A protein has these predicted regions:
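Residues lining hydrophobic/aromatic ligand-binding pockets adjacent to catalytic sites
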Residues: 2-198
Length: 198
């Protein structure tokens, strides 16, 4: 199960002041999920701009473990200012993933910064039975497979294309949300079918 951290931990002027909220959430019993616990998403307000010192301090607040259980953190910055090499470098240093978003309103940052990948696809179409056109699902299946095998798709926007990720197998988490939401389960199943057949 993937979790979305509460907004009060990240919707603040100074991210680095969220330590108590981060700790309260991490100690709220999430470790009870055991090996079923997936990534923890920290979603920033769309108005939150990149401040390297503050962002770096926030990343340091994210604990590596809870009650002995390894935690995997992913941040979703939704302001264009985060689409820069410095933000990517800070996440890579912390081992924190950045959401690879496919959205109309938010920047795409497809740089691999952790040992897993987390994508949020937000361009679904309720008029299509599978939520996404077949060609788009084919493309995302190909990207997911490439990520899982340790590669980096070259058709997505990266903030720091000069840096290549360490080539290693990765878990890949892909979510269909927002637009065409009623069709999201169908999109997920259609994507899984393509991956199973690959």
């Amino acid at each position: 199960f993937s979790l979305k951290a509460p907004r009060f931990a990240v919707n603040r002027k100074v991210l680095a002041e969220g330590g108590e909220s981060v700790e309260r959430f991490v100690q709220s019993g999430i470790a009870e999920l055991g090996d079923r616990l997936g990534p923890i998403l920290w979603q920033f307000a769309a108005t939150k701009q990149f401040d390297p010192d503050d962002f770096g301090a926030f990343l340091e607040l994210l604990p590596a473990k809870a009650e002995g259980l390894r935690l995997r953190h992913v941040v979703e910055p939704r302001h264009e200012s985060f689409a820069c090499p410095k933000a990517v470098a800070l996440c890579r240093k912390a081992g924190v993933a950045i959401v690879c978003a496919e959205a109309e309103d938010y920047p795409q940052i497809a740089d691999v910064t952790a040992d897993f990948l987390y994508a949020r696809l937000q361009k679904g179409d309720e008029a299509i039975s599978t939520g996404y056109p077949a060609a788009a699902l084919d493309a995302w299946a190909k990207r997911a497979k490439e990520w899982a095998e340790g590669g980096q798709p070259d058709d997505l926007r990266r903030a720091d294309p000069q840096v290549q990720p360490v080539r290693q197998e990765r878990d890949v988490f892909v979510y269909f949300i927002r637009s065409g939401k009623p069709r999201a389960p169908h999109a997920a199943m259609a994507l899984q079918e393509r991956l199973d057949a690959a």
